[in-house]
Amino acid sequence: MLFATLEHILTHISFSTISIVITIHLITLLVRELGRLRDSSEKGMIVTFFSITGFLVSRWVSSGHFPLSNLYESLIFLSWALYILHTIPKIQNSKNDLSTITTPSTILTQGFATSGLLTEMHQSTILVPALQSQWLMMHVSMMLLSYATLLCGSLLSAAILIIRFRNNFHFFSKKKKNVLNKTFFFSEIAFFYAKRSALKSAPVPSFPNYYKYQLTERLDSWSYRIISLGFTLLTIGILCGAVWANEAWGSYWNWDPKETWAFITWTIFAIYLHSRTNPNWKGTNSALIASIGFLIIWICYFGINLLGIGLHSYGSFTLTPK
């Protein structure tokens, strides 16, 4: 009872904090004079991280196994993984371009996990025999870490497509200022504008194209690095799952719906990484492939759980009639 109460408190603290964080983030986008509030949002993300970590540890101690046995626990772990990605730019002492992706993603996963739809999964239960293995932590954690990384990388690629295909792209138009112009990738304007002295010889109309090129190149670089990391984690997760499947079911691969879509996901991002070796496919073409991968990941992770079919149906989400 004590652990259940603690988990309930920590979960709602993390959700409430991340809600405040995203509100602050939106305010700073709309009102540039309140830019100092970003420090508060970063502190809020730290509180969220420790709350989610506390929940996972509490769940681990109370249940006796790593908390990855159902959709509810995996969503909490996914939000924790998104925060880890949120801290990567800080470790590299670079601008946190990922915050506009990781913060909303965290609140969405956290919000769905704490919603009434998954109430029956909130209580920890004894593992089913198929999950009573040391491979549980290795396989599932690698898969969820890869999902979080690939989702962020795919969203960055989608941002590239939005920038390149957006009509009437003007950075300095006073009549067309909106939230999109002030999100993480457009905030780079201030950085380049500070160095405008080196570009005084260039005509004014060339500025938007120059900024557009610089921003897309930066996003493309981030997307490639994050997807490369996610692809590596996905490969490790699939290999661990194959070994575990051989121990549990006597076969490395069974073409279960979850396994099939994991293979499709792996193939899509393998094509993306291969396309990066061809200069003609870099940029828009590779970003399009990664954007398709975004939908494939959600089908693999969430869609199969909705159907509740196959060998991976335990811990799935089903709507119960009232």
Curated annotation (Swiss-Prot):
Q: Where in the cell is it found?
A: Plastid, Chloroplast thylakoid membrane
Query: Per UniProt, what is one Pfam family of this protein?
Result: Cytochrom_C_asm
The terms describing its cellular component in GO are: chloroplast thylakoid membrane; plasma membrane
Q: How does the entry describe its membrane topology?
A: Multi-pass membrane protein
Say if the entry is tagged with keyword Thylakoid: yes
Keyword vocabulary terms for this entry:
Chloroplast, Cytochrome c-type biogenesis, Membrane, Plastid, Thylakoid, Transmembrane, Transmembrane helix
List the GO biological process terms: cytochrome complex assembly
**Reported function:** Required during biogenesis of c-type cytochromes (cytochrome c6 and cytochrome f) at the step of heme attachment.
What HAMAP family has UniProt attached to this entry? CytC_CcsA
Subunit structure comment from the entry: May interact with Ccs1.
* Annotated family: Belongs to the CcmF/CycK/Ccl1/NrfE/CcsA family.
Identify this protein by name: Cytochrome c biogenesis protein CcsA
Q: Give the organism, scientific name.
A: Hordeum vulgare (Barley)
Q: Which gene encodes it?
A: ccsA
